[in-house]
Curated annotation (Swiss-Prot):
It comes from Geobacillus thermodenitrificans (strain NG80-2). The gene is deoC. The lineage of its organism: Bacteria, Bacillati, Bacillota, Bacilli, Bacillales. This is Deoxyribose-phosphate aldolase. It is found in: Cytoplasm. Catalyzes a reversible aldol reaction between acetaldehyde and D-glyceraldehyde 3-phosphate to generate 2-deoxy-D-ribose 5-phosphate. GO terms for cellular component: cytoplasm.
Length: 223
């Protein structure tokens, strides 16, 4: 595979105990390897933006994370605040319970609130949390994300057990077609797995093992 995997990696550190020193190291690694972005919790966006101010590496953060169980208004506020602090990509979690309740109108409105808050200022990736969904629910979630104007659909938070699978990535790609990107996250710890996800249709990889992936090693625990 000749694709530049580094340019597809969101170099991720979302552990609650992450320190400022570790966030700075994450940014240094992203600069060194030319990753697409660093993905950090909202409290670290300013730090990451400062560290990456003179680079092409984008700052990504998470919204309604990891449960997705906040209101559309709260997610919109989080998005605005993150953008003010320097985020250029936001990964939001859908209202999973609403999806499972069949309340597609709320799911779409929830996504749209973030899309509108980010409009013209940040990419929006929609985490559907595949480990908690049936295939039918995965398809519906992806359709709603596209309908609401999201830029990407994303498999997982990394906090709900299972992560990305080739099967889920392929299903998501078939569902969105060329209308959105697909981000595989959770459990991608080596180059072989990353390449399998890309072959299945992923256009972005979320991982805390970015350095291991580009250097042919195997990374440790997720996020």
């Amino acid at each position: 595979m000749t694709v530049n995997i580094a340019k597809m990696i969101d170099h991720t550190l979302l552990k609650p105990e992450a320190t400022e020193e570790q966030i700075i190291q994450l940014c240094d690694e992203a600069k060194q390897h030319g990753f697409a972005s660093v993905c950090v919790n909202p409290a670290w966006v300013k730090t990451a933006a400062r560290e990456l101010s003179d680079t092409d590496v984008r700052v990504c953060t998470v919204i309604g994370f990891p449960l997705g169980a906040t209101t559309p208004e709260t997610k919109a506020f989080e998005t605005n605040n993150a953008i003010e602090n320097g985020a250029r990509e936001v990964d939001m979690v859908i209202n999973i319970g609403a999806l499972k309740s069949g309340n597609d109108e709320l799911v779409e409105r929830d996504i749209r609130a973030v899309v509108e808050a980010a409009s013209g200022k940040a990419l929006v990736k929609v985490i559907i949390e595949t480990a908690l969904l049936t295939d039918e629910e995965k398809v519906r979630a992806c359709q709603l994300a596209v309908k609401a104007g999201a830029d990407y659909v994303k498999t997982s938070t990394g906090f709900s057990g299972g992560g990305a699978t080739v099967e889920d990535v392929a299903l998501m790609r078939r569902t969105v077609g060329d209308k959105a990107g697909v981000k595989a996250s959770g459990g991608v710890r080596d180059r072989k797995t990353a390449e399998a996800m890309i072959e299945a249709g992923a256009t972005r990889i979320g991982t805390s093992s970015g350095v291991a992936i580009v250097s042919g090693q195997t990374g440790g625990a997720d996020y």
